[in-house]
Structure formats: C-alpha cells, structure tokens
Amino acid sequence: MSNYGLQLLYALMNRRADWACERVFAPYPDMEKALRKRNLPLYSLETFSPLSEFDVLGFTLQYELTYTNVLTMLDLGGIPLHSADRTMNDPLVIAGGPSAANPEPMSDFIDLFIIGDGEEALPAVCDFWLEMKQQYGDGRRQTADGSQKFRRQALLEAARKFPFVAAPQFYSVQYDSNGRPMRPRPNETGVPEIVQPARIDDLDTYEPPILRIVPTIECVQDRVTIEIMRGCPGRCKFCVSSVLKRPTRCRSPENIARIAKESCLATGSDEVSLLSLSTSDYPKFEELMAQLRENLTPLNVSVSVPSLRVNHQLCEVMQQLTTERTSGLTLAPEAARDEMRRRIGKPITNEHLLAGCESAFTNGFNRVKMYFMCGFPEETNDDIDGIIELAHTISRLGRKIWGKSVTVIANVSNFVPKPHTPWERLGMATQGYFLNAHDELKLRSKRTGIALKYHDLETSLLEALLCRGDRRLGRTIERAWRLGARLDSWSDYFRGDCWEEAIAETDVNVNQIVHEAVPDNAELVWEYVRF
C-alpha cells in the first residue's frame, strides 16, 4: 500500500457507484505454494473474489524486475497467460506505470498498455470495455474461437479509439540486417502510428484520497503521501521519470495543507511525505511549508521531503524543514564531481551540496543519505574515488557541527540507459567495469568509515535487458518464470540461475541489447510510444 498511484486510482474508481475496485498483490512463494496445493485461485483482498471473475485486471509496472510477478498472478488467478488465448469471458488485462514506456517485452501477456496519466485514462478504458462486453457478450454463450475473435475486435477498437493506448498485437516488428528490431508499425487500419501519453492539466482536479487505506500491519513508507508536483523542471540525461511525467504541474499549497490535515485526522498518521521528483523546485515552497506547519504542528505531525534538489535553495529549505524531530536528509547528487554533473545535465555544485548539508546539520539533521550512479559515459577513476571523498568530507562536516559522529550513507546504483531518455542509444558499461568500480568503492569506504551500499550488478544487467528489449523477450520472461523465477526485485528470492538458463534457451543476444550502442540512423523498438 506504499504506492501512491495505487491509492489514488483505487479511491478514484471506488467513488463511482457503477464500479467496485479491489486490490490484489503478488503472493510470497509460500502463499503461492499453499494456493496451488489446495487448488485455490488468487483472490482480491476486499471480497476474496477470484481474479478471473473481474471485468478488468490492472497491473502497475513500476520496475522491470516485477514482470514475473505478473505471470504468477495471472496463472494463480486462472487467467490465460497469453493475450491471444483469452476470450470475452476473461478479464481485460491492462498495465501502466514507468515500465510500460516500452511495452514490447510484456506484449505477449498484456492486452492494453495505458501510457501516461491514469486519472482520466483508466475510467475511460474501463467504461469502454463494459460497452464491448455488452456488445459482444461475455463469452459464455460463444465458442472459444468465436469469443477470441470478438475479443480481438474489441481490443482493436480500443487501439483505434484511445490515442494513449498501446496494443502491441496490432503492431508488427521487422528486423534490420544486424538483427535489431525496428520501430513497430500498425498492421490494422485506424491504429495510430504513434501512441501519445494521456495527460491531465490540473492536479487539483483529482484530489488524493482523504480516507485512504490503512493496513492492519505496518508497511513500508507508512505515512500520508501527497503529490505536490508532477513532472520536473530538470533535464538530467539519464532520468526517465522527468521525461514520462512532462509537463510540470503543481497542486495548490492551500489544497496540499488541507489534504494533509484531513488525511492525518482520518488515518491517525503522524508523518506527511511530500511527493514529487524535486520538491524544493515547487514554486511556492515557503508558503506551502508555512501552511503545513500551521495545520500539522498542533497534531504533532512531521513533514518528510524525500526529493530535494541540491542548489542554492537547499540552505533555505533546511531552515523551513526544522522540526522538533531529529531526522535524516536524502540527496541525489548522482555524481561526485561538478564536471561530471554538467555532463549528465545536473547543474549542481559541491559548494551548494556542502552548504546545504551544513545547514541541515545546524538545523537538527544528523543523518545524510546520498544517491550516486556509476557507469556514466566518459567516467574516470576520479569520478569513482570522488564518491567516497565527498561522503567523507560531509561526514567530517557533520562531526564538526555535532561534536560527534553523524551517519553518512553513499548509495551507488549502476547506470542503465533507459528508453526515451537523451541517452537511450548508449550501451550499458560492461560487467567487468562495474565489478572493478565496486571493488574500488568498497576499498575506499573501509578506509574512511563511510557506510556504502550499492545495487546488485546481476539485477541491474537484467533490468537493462528487460527495459531495452523487444517482444522476443516474452519467451525469455515466461521461461524464467516456469523455471522458478519469482519476486525478482527482492534479493531474498532472486534466482539468477533461472534467468541465465532462460536466456540461453531462448537465444537472446544480451550483448546487442544491453551493451552495444544503437546507431543514430537505426530505429528503436519503443519509438512507437512518444513522450
């Protein structure tokens, strides 16, 4: 229940009298085993209804390593894995979220991808599907072949009707002389050449839920979350989120403050988190913080700001965030040197970073977490070494102000060139490069006492394969799942051996997809979706 989008769309659909929106999550392997042993279907949390009884089943694809979760849920829910095998008696299977920006790898399993904002798009697609079921019937009085034919026609009408819907089965893919997939092109008349994202103009039109779901057990990020701004004024070359969420739109400060107070009173939460890609870039930040303090201080509710830009405003922001609670500061400098930041399109300086951290320590913060990346183009040893050097400098600064050790964490991820970003044509650095970089970081962190965390390399390479691949990867995903791949984004359950075997069996050219740069004159397989 930590996903803001799920809470928002759940509340939006349930405000309507003609829809009942319920929740279901991928089960842990022990629950999956118990369901299969007892021949029970996967069911919704609200009414324990089997998934196959719903009209529409929607997945949010937040991360490529959740793809096998989709197959687990479809199979446990009694729904055919492949879109082509479903009839009008089966739910419409839709998906949205960041990973839907390249629909191709999951095109065998998803009927329709909703691209862009879901507030208006989801109800429109759901209403349309009910019309199609009324027009063509639910499949119970039809032969399987006839019902599949009607379903295909209904999906085709959706692809023609909605400019924000990607229906991969109505696009054909050809391959160039090097075996690279070209841009998919329509194979039916009336299907658009290019899919355009759905966009809402005014965030205030779609208010976050006040009476949001409160789980009976504590969950990750157990707090009231309010989206204050969608989009980002920054243009970092590696960042896919800023591309997918364009243009920048803001919620009014008075609405944010009111929603925060009402939500805390309704749920009992003692923390409010302001959600955006760069909260300190919110145009009326000082006014917003003043209104939040007025509304929340009497309730003993704290405010969390997880996404802060490192610039000249950071010192002012630290003063605005001063509360009675000692808490942590999270920053994303991405690179340790000013020169590399200019190259990646993130115009911040170490001067601003150090000044902001000094202000944070002075105003009661005793913990700083910083997010970096390694594997950027033209990266040098100085860039790698600089990560620990910068963290060590901040650690010494904190000790000077507090008179004792503060916590400084350097969290290093591996750069994956994502579709739709300015660096989408680049290849990912090799496994050997990352291993050497990680070894150097570990060595230097031990000498300085800096807490170092870095992303697992095997899962980063798999992420690159799944986000940059084409529909041929559908066989690979399914084979890995049948071999036992489950909950791949959870380190306790990740089975790299399943993926290695599946990749070998399905003859995937990993080097071409992951590591080779795509020539400027070559087409990209995700180009039929435009942002």
What is each of the regions a protein language model found here?
Residues 8-20, 294-298:
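Short helix-loop-beta junction
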Residues 13, 214-237, 264, 414-416:
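N-terminal pre-triad scaffold of radical SAM enzymes
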Residues 26-139, 146-187, 422-470, 478-491:
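Glycine-rich beta-alpha loop elements in corrinoid/cobalamin-binding modules
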Residues 29-30, 105, 172-176, 283-284, ...:
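Flexible glycine/acidic-rich beta-alpha junction loops that bind and position SAM and/or redox cofactors
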Residues 65, 261-412:
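Conserved SAM/AdoMet-binding glycine-rich loop
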Residues 70, 122, 256, 285, ...:
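Aromatic/hydrophobic pocket-lining residues that form the small-molecule binding cavity
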Residues 168, 174-225:
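N-terminal [4Fe-4S]-dependent radical SAM core
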Residues 239-255:
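Iron-sulfur (Fe-S) cluster-binding segments and ferredoxin-like electron-carrier domains
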